[in-house]
């Protein structure tokens, strides 16, 4: 896990131009940053380098401009958010490469921080064009990647440049990689995984990878219905991908071969309409009526799943157990998340969670701060769970 270098290895950076890849792809409302979480994540790295006298040059993308300049996707729009979080003025350089970028960098002094323009304004970014990576490398002396959320992309600012300059992991990247290694790379066993969400089709590769790595696989959300159907359960009007029953059976077989126990709900909360607080029934999975939908895991199954977690030492969580955005179908997700949080607080469980819906669910349960690590990385977290190589990480190991 120490195959990559961190800021501990970077040496004297006084007066050095350090290109730092960060995640500034933040949500905006009425022209202002509405959630600065991603900016805040990069602050320890930015401050550390600035305090050590580096010239800190921030590289990032914003939106999907598809290789063309678009003023509605300029990083100038997020400057207010960056300055608010950092607590002082930051220079904006309206180019990322070329003479304009070089001129902007030339006026900076040690300790200064600047944001370069959206890297995706250049076709060479997403194409990982060697010429674009060369042009980026011309304006820096060192490279730091602090954007795990973009590490699954082989782009010029994540992969190409890391092979042209001395490359290091920033503090946020370092924390993420250590947490992920503790969860699946070299975990304390037994290991449990919670995988939820609406569709099996979006998580097939995750499930196939996990059955070979974890001891207990807890499947929830709409995707559990497909697995129940594969076991011969009539799930009524529930969301169910009947065309993937064979895939579900293949995953059952792979789990059996690997010694992984798959846990499905055996009691469920059903309703005839998917709406807030409708009339509901809690029934055995074999008692779902033809006009009912499964919308959450039932109380007996929640208790059994809590017992599974109590006997595990490591947990990876991706996706809610029920339709958590719509009460009362948040009950199972909240209850199991609070169990995991309590076990983490008492020191018996290492808990790592990730994915947009997962973060929202843990925040809803009020326990995101109690998990060992919560990743906001989305696609990169999912590809890591699938066991796929992450080009931005691999480039740091070169």
UniProtKB/Swiss-Prot annotation:
Cellular component, GO annotation: cytosol
Keyword Transferase: yes
EC number: 2.7.2.3
Compartmental location: Cytoplasm
Pfam families noted in UniProt: PGK
Record pathway: Carbohydrate degradation; glycolysis; pyruvate from D-glyceraldehyde 3-phosphate: step 2/5
Reactions this protein catalyses: (2R)-3-phosphoglycerate + ATP = (2R)-3-phospho-glyceroyl phosphate + ADP
GO biological process terms held by the UniProt record: gluconeogenesis; glycolytic process
Keywords for the protein's UniProt record, in alphabetical order: ATP-binding, Cytoplasm, Glycolysis, Kinase, Nucleotide-binding, Transferase
Keyword Nucleus belongs to the record: no
Principal location class: cytoplasm
Binding-site positions, ATP: 203, 325, 355-358
Major enzyme class: transferase
GO molecular function terms noted in the UniProt entry: ADP binding; ATP binding; phosphoglycerate kinase activity
Family: Belongs to the phosphoglycerate kinase family.
Name of the protein this chain belongs to: Phosphoglycerate kinase
Native species: Sphingopyxis alaskensis (strain DSM 13593 / LMG 18877 / RB2256)
Lineage, top ranks: Bacteria, Pseudomonadati, Pseudomonadota, Alphaproteobacteria, Sphingomonadales
Gene (name only): pgk
